Amino acid sequence: MSAEEQDTRSGGIQVIARAAELLRVLQAHPGGLSQAEIGERVGMARSTVSRILNALEDEGLVASRGARGPYRLGPEITRMATTVRLGVVTEMHPFLTELSRELDETVDLSILDGDRADVVDQVVPPQRLRAVSAVGESFPLYCCANGKALLAALPPERQARALPSRLAPLTANTITDRAALRDELNRIRVDGVAYDREEQTEGICAVGAVLRGVSVELVAVSVPVPAQRFYGREAELAGALLAWVSKVDAWFNGTEDRK
C-alpha cells in the first residue's frame, strides 16, 4: 500500500470514528442537540460537525427539524436496533430455554432502553406457581434484578443519566436512597449478580446478570421466582445463573466448542 493510500485509509477511519462519536452524543440526548451543542460536546470544529451531520442525515442516521437542528437519531437507527434485537432474541432463545429447564423457573431476556429494561424474550416453565411478566413490558432499572444488573454495567456518567431524580418506591422493599443503591451497584459489579427481593413487585423476587459480547446493546438475563420459593434458594439460583452466563459468553466469544 502506497503512502497516499495509507493516508486515505487513515482519513476514512477517522471520519467513521468521528461520526460514531456524534451518534453516541445524540444517543445520550434523545431530546436533540443543535450543531453548536454537538460541537461543544465532541470538541470538533463546527464545519466538521456540519459536514458529518449532513452525511449522516442523508443516510437517515440522524434527523433534524431545520438547517441548524435540533438533531436527533434518525429512523434508520431505529430500524437497525430492531434488527439487532430480533437477532439477539433468535440466538439467545435456546440458551434461555436451557436455563429455564435447569432451574424450572421463568427466564427473561432484557435490553437496556434509556432508563428502563425492556423484556424482549421469555421462557416460562410448566410450574403451576410461577413468576411471569410479558414480552414487551418495561421496568425501571433501579428496582428489578435485570435493571440493576444493567445499571451496574454502565459507566458512571451513563448510570447517572439512567436514574430518575427520585427513586419512587414500588413496594416497601424498593431501594429509594441513592447512596444505598450506589452501594448495591458496586456490589453487583464485584459479584456479577443482581438481586430483586420484592423490590419491584410484592411476592416476586429475582436474580439477574449482564451478558457481555452477545450484542452491541447491553443485554441482561433474569430469573424471577415467587418469593416463597426464592428465599433459601438465593445462592443456588445465583450460582446457576453465573455458571450459565459464563457458558453463554464463552460461546458467543468463540471460546467454547460449538459442536
Curated annotation (Swiss-Prot):
Q: Does Transcription regulation show up as a keyword for this record?
A: yes
Named from the GO MF annotations, one term is: DNA binding
Alphabetically, which GO biological process terms does the record hold?
Answer: negative regulation of DNA-templated transcription
Residue span(s) of domain IclR-ED: 88-259
Name the DNA-binding segment ranges: 35-54
Q: Which Gene3D superfamilies match?
A: 3.30.450.40, Winged helix-like DNA-binding domain superfamily/Winged helix DNA-binding domain
Protein keywords:
DNA-binding, Transcription, Transcription regulation
InterPro entries per record:
Cro/C1-type_HTH, GAF-like_dom_sf, HTH_CRP, HTH_MetabolicPath_Reg, Tscrpt_reg_IclR_C, Tscrpt_reg_IclR_N, WH-like_DNA-bd_sf, WH_DNA-bd_sf
Query: What span is annotated as the signal peptide, if there is one?
Result: none
Record-annotated HTH iclR-type domain positions: 13-75
Pfam entry (one):
HTH_IclR
Give the function comment from the record.
Binds to the upstream region of Rv1714 and probably modulates the expression of the downstream gene(s).
Q: PANTHER family per the record? A: HELIX-TURN-HELIX TRANSCRIPTIONAL REGULATOR, ICLR FAMILY, HTH-TYPE TRANSCRIPTIONAL REGULATOR RV1719
Subunit organization: Homodimer.
List the protein's name: HTH-type transcriptional regulator Rv1719
Q: Which organism is it from?
A: Mycobacterium tuberculosis (strain ATCC 25618 / H37Rv)
